[in-house]
Amino acid sequence: MTTQYGFFIDSSRCTGCKTCELACKDYKDLTPEVSFRRIYEYAGGDWQEDNGVWHQNVFAYYLSISCNHCEDPACTKVCPSGAMHKREDGFVVVDEDVCIGCRYCHMACPYGAPQYNETKGHMTKCDGCYDRVAEGKKPICVESCPLRALDFGPIDELRKKHGDLAAVAPLPRAHFTKPNIVIKPNANSRPTGDTTGYLANPKEV
């Protein structure tokens, strides 16, 4: 492998506007039921009593997540046709001419990245906009973010600059697939496995 690319996700800046998601859908000409990049809204809170006075303790934050082009992708391990594979540049892609649409990859991926396209009759997924990257550009989701909450580049450089945090609630623990992402947590971020909050928009992700 030459260079492993990855995404930087700044949850402290993300407002959940979904511009990245819509830009991706437009650029990739996706059908309504398919979204390669999705916005997770994690929320929670309760009431706390202080000397007879009750106060709210509510929180919410957003995470913009697509395929994480994992170091150890679960999707490629279960693909019976070999359609799902990891390229030399680290991008995990699906060969749509080879895919048989069994959906095993979707069931295996803890991030739900591979998605079935009803119109095409097979799986589709984020390919990291490798065509744009080859031209020296960044993925369309990164360039469209109005708050600059996303970045992209060689994962080693991103980790050197931003650290190596790759999981907060509601994401799974990073050791399962070793995702090539770096997260700057929101001030309200909870650790993976947290039970004080919940995924507020399950139908959207």
UniProtKB/Swiss-Prot annotation:
Its signal peptide is: none
Q: Which cofactor does it need?
A: [4Fe-4S] cluster
What are the disulphide bonds in this sequence? none
The residues that hold [4Fe-4S] cluster 2 are C24, C126, C129, C141
UniProt binding sites for [4Fe-4S] cluster 3? C67, C70, C75, C109
Query: Sorted alphabetically, which SUPFAM superfamilies does this protein's record hold?
Result: 4Fe-4S ferredoxins
This chain's function reads: Electron transfer subunit of the terminal reductase during anaerobic growth on various sulfoxide and N-oxide compounds.
Question: Which protein, by its recorded name, is this?
Answer: Anaerobic dimethyl sulfoxide reductase chain B
Q: Which organism is it from?
A: Escherichia coli (strain K12)
